Swiss-Prot record:
The keyword Signal does not apply. Keywords: Cytoplasm, DNA replication, DNA-binding, DNA-directed DNA polymerase, Nucleotidyltransferase, Transferase. SMART domains: POL3Bc. GO terms for biological process: DNA strand elongation involved in DNA replication. The lineage of its organism: Bacteria, Pseudomonadati, Pseudomonadota, Gammaproteobacteria, Vibrionales. This is Beta sliding clamp. Its main location: cytoplasm. The keyword Ribosomal protein does not apply. It is found in: Cytoplasm. Confers DNA tethering and processivity to DNA polymerases and other proteins. Acts as a clamp, forming a ring around DNA (a reaction catalyzed by the clamp-loading complex) which diffuses in an ATP-independent manner freely and bidirectionally along dsDNA. Initially characterized for its ability to contact the catalytic subunit of DNA polymerase III (Pol III), a complex, multichain enzyme responsible for most of the replicative synthesis in bacteria; Pol III exhibits 3'-5' exonuclease proofreading activity. The gene is dnaN. GO terms for molecular function: 3'-5' exonuclease activity; DNA binding; DNA-directed DNA polymerase activity. Forms a ring-shaped head-to-tail homodimer around DNA which binds and tethers DNA polymerases and other proteins to the DNA. The DNA replisome complex has a single clamp-loading complex (3 tau and 1 each of delta, delta', psi and chi subunits) which binds 3 Pol III cores (1 core on the leading strand and 2 on the lagging strand) each with a beta sliding clamp dimer. Additional proteins in the replisome are other copies of gamma, psi and chi, Ssb, DNA helicase and RNA primase.
Length: 366
């Protein structure tokens, strides 16, 4: 195996592929990249057995077909350390990879390509296509609500639901929930999959060309996305996601409407003096006035008064201010609507001018 490539063509795909590996590999082979040259294409593959990322780069220089695995971190650091204008030659000699550029020479240990784990061949059951901007939007509007290391393993990820002509993303950690939707160009049978947290966070990094398409292939236990020159595959979480429709407040009797940024800043200031552990703030609503108060064990107090549009009977309700701020930081809209029924029921938060995302926040007792 042999290939020659300009550093500028190699470095970005190499960085993105290596990025999927994260921390220390559980097996030596998982710390390696699979390099494969066939025809005039170099493919680089990394996997941690949960997600797999393949990058394909067209070779313009001379090449010889073959495949081998090399230590990912060392190979990346060598290529990163070479000058921007460098031309890199990679050559397999025996069981060593020679990396050469200008007056620099490196000899790296290898492991056989046959040892590299392959996410098993699988059949795609559904294939959908949408723009990268649409998929990125679905993820960015909801990813903050994913659980992290929850014993309810099915919450440590994101639900994607195909429902007719709609693709939805749903995430919840049991305290708050986010739902977003985008329209598909065709009509599909209903299907739900749970993509693990790591798969979601790695996939969104690849979606950097808003107008370009992304093709999603969904199988029984895998999701594959073809994005630009990458093929991304993630195993799916084998579990049942809670019925998010039952969590959405159905009958609300109190509605607050106000500027999103004004509300965000008021909650941010009140949060400074909230209890560091429980992050509780008290909200009082009556007669188009809103009062936000917070205090902490040091007996320090914060109070914010806002003029708002409010319909319904007066209410006093408590929230974890971090959850409210996560929603408002994600919405970043002009005007926000908050719908409630009583102090013990969840609140529904929405952008007044856009119904493509909904947020549910559970109240807390103060």
């Amino acid at each position: 195996m042999k290939f020659t490539i300009e550093r500028s063509h190699l470095i970005k795909p190499l960085q993105q592929v290596s990025g999927t590996l994260g921390g220390r590999a559980s097996l030596p082979i998982l710390g390696n990249l699979l390099l494969k040259v066939e025809e005039n294409q170099l493919s680089m593959t990394a996997t941690d057995l949960e997600v797999e990322l393949i990058s394909r780069v067209t070779l313009e220089g001379e090449f010889e077909a073959g495949s081998i695995t090399v230590p990912a971190r060392k190979f990346l650091d060598i290529c990163r350390g070479l000058p921007d204008s460098a031309v890199i030659t990679v050559l397999l000699e025996g069981d060593r990879i020679q990396v050469r550029s200008g007056r620099s020479r490196f000899s790296l240990a290898t492991l056989p390509a046959s040892d590299f784990p392959n996410i098993e061949d699988w059949q795609s059951e559904v294939q959908v296509s949408l723009t990268q901007a649409e998929l990125r939007g679905l993820i960015e509007k909801t990813q903050f609500s994913m659980a992290n290391q929850d014993v309810r393993y099915y919450l440590n990820g994101m639900l994607f639901e195909i429902d007719g002509t709609t693709l939805r993303s749903v995430a919840t950690d049991g305290h708050r929930m986010a739902v977003a939707q985008a329209q598909l160009g065709a009509d599909f049978a209903q299907k739900q999959i749970i993509v693990p947290r790591k798969g979601v966070l790695e996939l969104v990094k690849l979606l950097d060309a808003p107008e370009q398409p992304v093709v999603l292939q969904i199988g029984h236990s895998n999701l594959r996305a073809e994005v630009n020159h990458f093929v991304f595959t993630s195993k799916l979480v084998d579990g049942r996601f809670p019925d998010y429709r039952r969590v959405l407040p159905q009958h609300t009797s109190k509605t607050l409407q106000t500027g999103c940024e004004e509300l965000r800043q008021a909650f941010s200031r009140a949060a400074i003096l909230s209890n560091e552990k429980f992050r509780g703030v008290r909200v009082n609503l009556a007669d188009n006035g809103m009062r936000i108060t917070a205090n902490n064990p040091e007996q320090e107090e914060a109070e914010e008064l806002l003029d708002v549009s409010f319909e319904g009977e007066p209410i006093e309700i408590g929230f974890n201010v971090s959850y409210i701020l996560d929603v408002l930081n994600t919405l970043r809209c002009d005007n926000v609507r908050v719908s409630m029924s009583d102090a013990n029921a969840s609140a529904l938060v929405e952008n007044v001018d856009d119904d493509s995302a909904m947020y549910v926040v559970m109240p807390i007792r103060l």
